[in-house]
């Protein structure tokens, strides 16, 4: 099990987390006062877990306008060795980038941003202590490295969008 989508739909603990004043105050500072919860995900990168290639979150989530910020809370210490996130600062200003390059994850086909569209010289590692939090825009180009340790790397991603953003996908996609 690598990911659990929508834990807040099943346990009020995650709803309370999304409403926590320190988290919401930061989101409001970044997005303004009219925000709503889009969803959340638990990520569990196991020992030996593979990388996740460069992507943007918004193209995976069918919302318009693409105004989303993710609060990513580390449940374990997050290091370069256990698969931290890498971001290209300011890349959200470019807008949505075509995720046109195929990438195989075991038997599952995924898509990634072509390497030619990424400014790797600006890449920055986001390391966190357990309980630490990072924020990134839904159009920020980011990836995570492989887990080369014998410990899990777990995190809780809570996605917020502006109140004017709307779900544009089908009912089975959400």
Task: List each language-model region with its residue ranges.
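Non-heme Fe(II)-dependent double-stranded beta-helix
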Residues: 1-63, 99-100, 171
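Residues that flank catalytic or metal-binding motifs in active/ligand-binding sites
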Residues: 10, 38-39, 67, 81-83, ...
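Active-site rim elements
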Residues: 11-16, 118-125, 143-146
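Catalytic core of non-heme Fe(II) oxygenases with the double-stranded beta-helix
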Residues: 25, 51-125, 165-173
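A structural signal for short, well-ordered beta-strand segments
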Residues: 39-42, 71-73, 156-160
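Non-catalytic surface loops within mature trypsin-like serine protease
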Residues: 46, 75-77, 160-162
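Non-heme Fe(II)/2-oxoglutarate
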Residues: 101, 133-135, 139-174
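Short acidic-glycine-tyrosine-enriched beta hairpin
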Residues: 122-135
């Amino acid at each position: 099990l690598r990911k659990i989508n929508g834990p807040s739909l099943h346990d009020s603990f995650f709803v309370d987390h999304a409403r926590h004043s320190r988290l919401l105050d930061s989101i409001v500072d970044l997005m303004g006062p009219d925000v709503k919860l889009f969803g959340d995900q638990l990520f569990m990168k196991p020992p030996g877990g593979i990388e996740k290639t460069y992507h943007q979150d918004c193209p995976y989530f069918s919302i318009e306008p693409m105004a989303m910020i993710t609060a990513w809370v580390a449940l374990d210490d997050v290091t370069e060795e256990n698969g931290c996130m890498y971001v290209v600062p300011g890349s959200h200003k470019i807008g949505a980038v075509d995720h046109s390059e195929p990438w195989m994850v075991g038997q599952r086909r995924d898509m990634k941003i072509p390497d030619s569209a990424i400014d790797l010289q600006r890449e920055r590692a986001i390391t966190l202590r357990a309980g630490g939090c990072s924020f990134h825009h839904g159009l920020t180009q980011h990836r995570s490295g492989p887990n080369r340790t014998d410990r899990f790397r777990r995190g809780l991603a809570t996605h917020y969008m502006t109140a004017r953003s709307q779900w544009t996908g089908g009912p089975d996609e959400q």
